[in-house]
């Protein structure tokens, strides 16, 4: 090195390596309404019901810095939005109270309809029960259909190219390659069924 070792300053290093940035502005509009009340009763107590609806719109805008070299991250400008409409109902139904087989027994029900602008419509639900044979012991069980919808970046992120690396455990090396990341508006929500059981013991 004819210039010597360790003589480069930060300004020269920034010029050679390159520095890029992406300024992102996020905005969310939410309109929601809900109501709850009792629609009747069983011999164990009143039946409670809750209704809700919501509309959300997420808007994002990204402005990249210019002139960055490809290996420093070539960010692209983007401007997009994604909206969601939801409607839900929940109910709590008492089935027994002060009985010989149960100090209390309750059934909970819930359903939700969600319509995503890009991912389409999905339905989720939950059925649960809480049984207390005695006041100090409660058994709980829940069965539900759950989802995870793609987020804004996964759907609409602008193209971002740059140098990537991956570790190869067979050769113990980390080769580098040129790659590109971008959003995919055709992604669908992930779905899963969940079953849970548990108990709560509170000695008096």
Where are these regions (language model features)?
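Active-site-proximal flexible loops/turns
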Residues: 61, 119, 193
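Hydrophobic, lipid-facing positions within transmembrane beta-strands of outer-membrane proteins
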Residues: 27-35, 85-93, 123-129, 137, ...
